[in-house]
């Protein structure tokens, strides 16, 4: 591959980090021009770089690469394919392909001429896959040949008909590779481009679906441009940068933020098919990457992995992502010699973001006073029993005090109005569920993030938990994320997820942690460890030792099924343990013990 190197790479000389104000101002400068050119889409950004540096690598994988000129031409072929296939402005094309160069080229090209591209999770099968396709109502589906069986398996559940095009197999009846090869790759004429503007919908990106069926969030061309240039500014990206992206391209962080931040700056994106802890550092060194995009669980997996001879031979200057917890921040940065961490908070469908440009360990960001109008965020108190916002005598929501956890909300509107745009979902009813009205004044409206946060005395926001993941036990709120951190820090625990389970005759829900362990795990010492880390009400009452934990493609844990199975040894084949209220240690939970809990003989 062009530009690949091997062996030891000389570490760059330590450069003084730019001030927070300069970082913010750079991002503002790069995004300020978006509104002045409403007909300029992200594909035009690629074209501009293709004119300036045609031979520089834009996208690369282990076995292929495209320079900027090649990417520009590939985008044009996909745009002309959409037109030739009859894709009109607003029509949807579903994309079911693994990470790769053509993934990015496809959605950039199809959306350039007004098509809307639905980015479908490649791990879905059956009814789940049919649901996501059905929500999008596509006229066409582009599917990788290796994923065609999954699509065929979902066909009986599909209620919409779409033309299916196969990618990667020229022998198929509708082979998109063959169709693309027959099309011109030169610049599009004004007539071919049509009247597409930044206000138009470009993509459908699905929520993770950890608690239910995924919802399709609407992503406009404006949002793509803002994400790309904003992160290019925050990271100080240049054409010399190479970013490693091993996150799924069908999600907003891996598929839009990571590649577009580099392409906006003329840099290069190295795309891995998926995350691999064993391949991660060799890839970083081999491709001479200067940045990588992370999510928090990726960092935790890397810390749990055995040392690699490559982990300190990199030339990284910055890593960017979200979800890096405070309990591993310092260890992660020190072990892997990472000069700077840019942590941020954002929701695919949300209308405000937070950015920790100062590198404050454990914080997800702050809002500088000069940008308060651009990122209008607040924290409101919630009813601990039902999760609804509390209201005062006048009927308005109650702001949280410093240090107090509450739901993060963002005011809906334009920047000029002191708000942020909320583009919502494809279903109006789902959009309405996320809007909180008459919050601090009659007639105002705010986006509900569904996330609990607290604001510290320095003005930094800290993530506490997802509202649906928090439960009450012994009259106290338990944040599952904090419990997970404590459990994972115990010797021999590879992974953990925590949830609440109901016990007959008790109020609230008791904590239960499902864990994956190795040979170093000793259950008899776990209770003492947790007693040092957690208050009594937050310590898991039950422990389940599982072979593996189910998670989404971005490592968000799926715990609904675990919660339904509960702690009944008759329904769960995994080993179960209970925190004995008499001894304070974890003991085996068998059928006899379960019956005593059910009868109230053992009171927890």
Residue ranges and their predicted role:
Residues 124, 131, 141-143, 292, ...:
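AMP-binding/adenylate-forming catalytic core of the ANL superfamily
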Residues 67-69, 195, 202-226:
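Conserved AMP-binding A3 loop
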Residues 534-557, 574-601:
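AMP-binding/adenylate-forming catalytic domain of the ANL superfamily
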Residues 286-294, 303-384, 421, 425:
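Gly/Ser/Thr-rich phosphate-binding loop
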Residues 114, 225-242, 250-290, 305:
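Conserved AMP-binding/adenylation subdomain of ANL enzymes
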Residues 36-39, 43-47, 55-100, 104-108, ...:
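Conserved AMP-binding/adenylate-forming core of the ANL superfamily
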Residues 24-25, 148-198, 375-377:
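ANL superfamily adenylate-forming
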Residues 54, 166, 184-206, 213, ...:
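Conserved pre-ATP/AMP-binding loop-to-beta segment of ANL
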């Amino acid at each position: 591959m062009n530009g690949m190197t091997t062996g030891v790479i000389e570490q760059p000389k330590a450069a003084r980090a730019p001030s927070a104000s300069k970082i913010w101002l750079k991002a503002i400068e790069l995004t300020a021009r978006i509104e002045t050119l409403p007909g300029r889409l992200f594909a035009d950004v690629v074209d501009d770089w293709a004119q300036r540096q045609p031979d520089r690598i834009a996208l690369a994988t282990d076995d292929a690469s495209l320079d900027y000129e090649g990417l520009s031409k590939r985008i044009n072929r996909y745009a002309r394919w959409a037109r030739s296939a009859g894709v009109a402005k607003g029509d949807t094309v579903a994309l079911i392909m693994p990470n790769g160069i053509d993934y990015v080229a496809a959605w950039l090209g199809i959306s350039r001429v007004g098509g809307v591209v639905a980015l479908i999770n490649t791990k879905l099968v059956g009814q789940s896959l049919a649901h996501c396709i059905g929500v999008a109502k596509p006229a066409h589906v582009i599917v990788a040949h290796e994923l065609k069986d999954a699509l065929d398996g979902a066909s009986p559940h599909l209620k919409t008909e779409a033309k299916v095009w196969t990618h990667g197999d020229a022998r198929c009846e509708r082979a998109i590779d063959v169709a693309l090869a027959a099309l011109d790759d030169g610049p599009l004429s004004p007539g071919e481009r049509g009247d597409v503007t930044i206000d138009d919908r470009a993509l459908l990106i699905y929520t993770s679906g950890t608690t239910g069926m995924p919802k399709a969030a609407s992503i406009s061309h404006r949002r793509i441009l803002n994400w790309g240039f904003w992160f290019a500014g925050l990271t100080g990206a240049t054409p010399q940068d190479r970013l490693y992206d091993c996150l799924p391209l069908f999600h907003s962080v891996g598929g839009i933020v990571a590649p577009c931040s580099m392409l906006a700056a003329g840099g290069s994106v190295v795309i891995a098919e998926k995350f691999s802890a064993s391949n991660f550092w060799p890839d970083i060194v081999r491709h001479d990457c200067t940045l990588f995009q992370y999510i928090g669980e990726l960092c935790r997996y890397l810390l749990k992995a055995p040392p690699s001879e490559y982990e300190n031979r990199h030339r990284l200057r910055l890593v960017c992502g979200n979800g890096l917890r405070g309990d591993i921040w310092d260890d992660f940065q020190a072990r892997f010699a990472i000069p700077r961490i840019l942590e941020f908070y954002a929701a695919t469908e949300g209308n405000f973001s937070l950015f920790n440009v100062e590198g404050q360990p454990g914080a997800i960001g702050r809002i500088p006073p000069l940008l308060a109008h651009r990122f209008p965020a607040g924290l409101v108190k919630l009813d601990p029993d039902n999760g609804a916002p509390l209201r005062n005598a006048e009927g308005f929501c109650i702001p949280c005090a410093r240090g107090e956890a509450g739901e993060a909300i963002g005011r809906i509107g334009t920047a000029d109005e002191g708000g942020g745009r909320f583009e919502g979902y494809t279903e109006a009813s789902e959009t309405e569920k996320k809007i909180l009205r008459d919050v601090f004044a009659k007639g105002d409206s705010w986006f509900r993030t569904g996330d609990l946060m607290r604001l510290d005395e320095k003005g930094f926001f800290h993530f506490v938990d997802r509202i649906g993941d928090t439960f009450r036990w012994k009259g106290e709120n338990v944040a599952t994320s904090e419990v997970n951190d404590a459990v994972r820090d115990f010797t021999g625990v590879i992974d953990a997820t925590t949830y609440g389970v109901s016990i007959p005759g008790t109020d609230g829900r008791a904590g239960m942690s499902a864990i994956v362990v190795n040979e170093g795990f000793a259950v008899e010492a776990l209770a003492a460890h947790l007693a040092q880390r957690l208050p009594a009400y937050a310590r898991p009452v039950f422990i389940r030792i599982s072979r593996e934990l189910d998670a989404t493609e971005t490592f968000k844990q799926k715990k609904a099924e675990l919660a339904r199975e509960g702690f009944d040894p008759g329904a769960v084949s995994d080993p179960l343990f209970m925190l004995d209220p008499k001894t304070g240690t974890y003991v085996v939970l068998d059928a006899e013990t379960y019956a005593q809990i059910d009868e109230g003989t053992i009171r927890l």
